[in-house]
């Protein structure tokens, strides 16, 4: 965590507000270490919440030992899986918005957040020209829809997070069996 923070400061010139956990592998000890090092949030998969029936378009706080807390954002599984595993989903940004984004909001005018998570190497390495898809999506196609782009640190500056949840200990995004893929045979 300290190395990640130091690298972020070296690269971007300021301390990070959040941190992506590798494979979103998480437990309370890890969240506590993040909070103790000034990290305010991380992003997890929806199935990493112990609490059920949540609105994934809003972040939640997790109470940590010692009276600390950390905010958890959840990525949208359907959108993220389509981006990562369905090459046709990311060929046309306008169609992507129509198929994957427009129906994700409740339409009542309240602020909602839809997070897509994918591996960075997807854009241009695994899928040729997906970097251009992403650039047009963010800098062109979305501007005509009323959907605004943001990022978690900015969201936290503009919105209070009041609800608390519990996480499922020792889980990750990439394995429904938890984190045993790194210490044992998965499954």
Q: Which residues fall in each region the model found?
A:
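Gly/Pro-rich turn-and-neighbor structural signature
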Residues: 1-70, 111-112, 117-118, 124-128
């Amino acid at each position: 965590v300290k190395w990640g923070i130091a690298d972020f400061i070296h690269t971007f010139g300021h301390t990070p507000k959040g941190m992506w956990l590798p494979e979103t592998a998480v437990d309370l000890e890890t969240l506590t270490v993040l909070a103790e090092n000034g990290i305010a949030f991380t992003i997890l998969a929806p199935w990493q919440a112990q609490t059920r029936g949540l609105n994934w378009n809003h972040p939640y706080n997790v109470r940590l030992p010692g009276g600390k807390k950390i905010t958890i954002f959840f990525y949208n599984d359907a959108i993220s899986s389509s981006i990562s595993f369905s090459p046709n989903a990311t060929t046309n940004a306008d169609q992507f918005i129509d198929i994957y984004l427009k129906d994700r909001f409740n339409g009542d005018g309240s602020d909602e957040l839809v997070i897509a998570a994918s591996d960075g190497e997807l854009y241009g390495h695994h899928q040729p020209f997906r970097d251009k898809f992403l650039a047009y999506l963010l800098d062109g196609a979305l501007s005509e829809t009323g959907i605004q782009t943001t990022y978690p640190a900015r969201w936290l500056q503009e919105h209070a997070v009041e609800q608390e949840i519990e996480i499922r200990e020792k889980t990750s995004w990439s394995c429904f069996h938890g984190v045993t893929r790194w210490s044992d045979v998965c499954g």
